[in-house]
Amino acid sequence: MSIKTQSFAASNIGRVRKSNQDSGYAGYNFFFVADGMGGHAGGDIASALIAQGVAKADRVYDNTDAAAESVVEALLEANSKLAETVENHPELKGMGTTFSGIIVTGDLVTLTHIGDSRVFMVSDDQVKQVTKDHTFVQRLVDTGRITPAEALVHPRRSVLMRSEEHTSELQSLRHIS
C-alpha cells in the first residue's frame, strides 16, 4: 500500500514580525519547512539556502535508507553553503534555521528534524506530535526540572539547542508508518 498525498504550502508573516523568515516545500514525495531563526541576521537567507539545497532530494527512492541518506547528504551540503555564505558575509554570522521534513517511500515515511518546527501525524481522528523540540526548555522538561505546562509560558521557550547553523547533528527517524 502506498501513502497518498495532497499538499500545498503557505506562509503568513503574522501580526508580530516585520519579515517572514520561513521557507517551505511541498513536492511529490518530499515535504518540509525551514524556519529561519528570528532575532538573528539572515534567518530568511538561511532558510532559503537550506530549502533550495534540500529540495533536490525530492525523487522516488527504492527504500527508506536511501531516502534518509539523500536528505541528510543534501542538508549537509546546504549547511556547507550556509557556512560559506557567512564566511563571505560576516554580517550574517549567527544565521540559522530549523528544518523538519518528511519524504514518502511507498507506505513508509522518513522524517528528518532539527530545531523546533514540529511534525504531526494525523490518522483517522488522532493527531500525534512525532518530533521533539531541540530547545533549552524541552531539555528542562526532559530532565524533570519543569513541567510541560510550565514550558508553555517559560520566557526561554524559543531558545534553540540545535539548528542548521554550525551542526551536522540531525535526528533522522526512519520507518514511520
Language-model features, listed with the residues they occupy:
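PP2C/PPM-type serine/threonine phosphatase catalytic domain
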Residues: 1-168, 172
